[in-house]
Design a protein with these regions (language model features):
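A conserved FAD-binding loop/helix module that cradles the flavin
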Residues: 195-238, 244
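FAD-site-proximal beta/loop scaffold in flavoenzymes
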Residues: 23, 29-56, 148-151, 155-213
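A Rossmann-like FAD-binding core segment of flavoenzymes
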Residues: 6, 11, 84-175, 230-231
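Flavin (FAD/FMN) cofactor-binding core of flavoprotein oxidoreductases
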Residues: 103, 235-252
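Residues at the starts of beta-strands that form the adenosine-phosphate
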Residues: 59, 92-96, 191
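C-terminal auxiliary extensions adjacent to catalytic cores
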Residues: 253-301
Length: 301
């Protein structure tokens, strides 16, 4: 640790994510020109300044990596909110969504509707694997096309945060931490519990803040039992809710419930539980803000 060694009986890690810019030619070392803005802070401020400086009639191009990545609906929400800003401030402009995936990864029908409502302002292009970028000309080289942008936002491929590899945690595909879902302990490393986006995901389990909060509760309950010499809960249940703004006021959501399956040894989505919004509306916007206040209070109490 920063101020010296700390002894522990059980260790809980939430490594988050780190990026693999080297997998895209020309990107590494150029993220001041081509921001990812996928970690809040200077990068998100940088992207905002670039958008504010973009001329009316300019092109904002965003590239989405292949799943899994942090926050499945996040890139599509960003596209909507950038379009909402440009529609008012720079209506001659264009939002180009270059998706390495074959389709929208979350709330597909709802985001498709949202993009359609923006008309010619938004163009969604699936199966757009990014080969390389030119930071001087802000050009994205796809497998079969070359895209010139005024603002180029490339979200690189991801893996578990650097501490995961440095600590020798077991990684699936050299990227995501393999865990025992009953305790969230890293496989082969008893006493080391890992949470959040860094995990190799169970089926249909998103890398979201809400899910990380749920992981923490499963781990905490398991740790209390283990300290008492008791087995962990054999059937933990976790839930997820994710709200996405499609403009300044209208919001959509997705929710899911996942229960541990003893045979498969991982959480499985509960059929019929959760679901998605019927349509974007302002009432869901109020629910989104209430959700945010509640989860902040829960996590920061």
């Amino acid at each position: 640790a920063k101020h010296g060694a700390i002894a522990w009986d059980r260790l809980v890690l939430s490594p988050g994510i780190d990026f693999l810019p080297g997998r895209i030619g020309g990107l590494e070392g150029n993220q001041e020109r081509i921001p990812h803005a996928w970690k809040a802070g200077p990068q998100t401020v940088l992207l905002r300044k670039q958008l504010e400086a973009m001329p009316d009639g300019g092109v904002f191009a965003m590239h989405i990596p292949r799943a899994p990545y942090r926050c499945p609906p996040g890139p599509y929400e960003r596209a909507c909110l950038v379009a909402n800003y440009l529609r008012d401030a720079k209506p001659k402009s264009k939002v180009l969504v270059l998706d390495a995936n074959g389709e929208i990864q979350s709330k597909k029908a709802l985001f498709t509707q949202a993009f359609e409502r923006y008309g010619a302002l938004v163009e969604y292009v699936p199966n757009s694997a990014l080969q390389s970028v030119d930071a001087d000309t802000l050009t994205a080289e796809l497998e079969f096309d070359s895209i010139k942008a005024d603002v180029l936002n490339v979200i690189p491929p991801m893996r578990a945060g650097n501490i995961a590899a440095a600590a020798g945690l077991p990684l699936i595909n050299d990227a995501w931490v393999d865990v025992d879902w009953l305790t969230l302990e890293a496989k082969g490393m008893p006493g080391v519990h890992v949470l959040g986006d860094a995990l190799f995901p169970a089926p249909a389990m998103p890398k979201s803040g809400h899910m990380a909060n749920q992981h923490a509760k499963v781990a905490a309950a398991a740790i209390l039992n283990l300290f008492e010499g008791l087995p962990p809960n054999p059937t933990p249940v976790v839930m997820n809710t994710c709200y996405s703004f499609v403009d300044a006021k209208n919001v959509i959501h997705v929710a899911s419930v996942h229960q541990f399956d003893a045979e498969k040894k991982q959480p499985i989505p509960v059929s019929g539980a959760g679901g998605v919004s019927s349509m974007a509306n302002e009432l869901e916007g109020k629910s989104a803000l209430a959700w945010a206040r509640n989860i902040w209070a829960d996590m920061l109490a």
